[in-house]
Amino acid sequence: MSQTRDLQGGKAFGLLKAQQEERLDEINKQFLDDPKYSSDEDLPSKLEGFKEKYMEFDLNGNGDIDIMSLKRMLEKLGVPKTHLELKKLIGEVSSGSGETFSYPDFLRMMLGKRSAILKMILMYEEKAREKEKPTGPPAKKAISELP
């Protein structure tokens, strides 16, 4: 009955995310060295931003975004999609299996000329973050501003 409980689950998750970040950094270096993408402006900062987005939705750290992760991402952005639409989107992006897409697939899609829906999704997410509600009491209005 003496079971040992790991009370440091957050520490293990942090280590998992650190390992994932190292793997993604190696892939970013390959893209930085690739002459195909050398003409892109501000490539290092773009790759860093894409890495952060990818890590946000690859919660299990296995290196692939699956249908449920993509569904969660789209719902978070207020653009829910059906299961069939998600399968079609992943099939468009993925170079391997039809159920997931990897980080290199994600980068090729984002940096490629035929950027699809996910590029628009990331753009809309950035716009949504800019519109934060003002905090504190509302500003006083003059009588002329009242309806």
UniProtKB/Swiss-Prot annotation:
N-acetylserine found at: 2
Locations listed in the record: Cytoplasm, Cytoskeleton; Cell projection, Ruffle membrane; Cell projection, Phagocytic cup
InterPro entries: AIF-1_EF_pair (IPR049025), AIF1/AIF1L (IPR042433), EF-hand-dom_pair (IPR011992), EF_hand_dom (IPR002048)
Pfam families cross-referenced by the UniProt entry: AIF-1
Tissue: Detected in T-lymphocytes and peripheral blood mononuclear cells.
Membrane topology designation: Peripheral membrane protein
Gene Ontology terms: cellular component: actin filament; cytoplasm; cytosol; glial cell projection; lamellipodium; nucleus; perinuclear region of cytoplasm; phagocytic cup
Binding site for Ca(2+) 2: 100, 105
Gene Ontology terms: biological process: actin crosslink formation; actin filament bundle assembly; actin filament polymerization; cellular response to oxidative stress; cellular response to type II interferon; inflammatory response; microglial cell activation; negative regulation of smooth muscle cell chemotaxis
Region called Disordered, residue ranges: 128-147
Keyword Nucleotide-binding listed: no
Domain EF-hand positions: 45-80, 81-115
Quaternary data: Homodimer (Potential). Monomer. Interacts with LCP1.
Name under which the protein is recorded: Allograft inflammatory factor 1
Source organism of this protein record: Homo sapiens (Human)
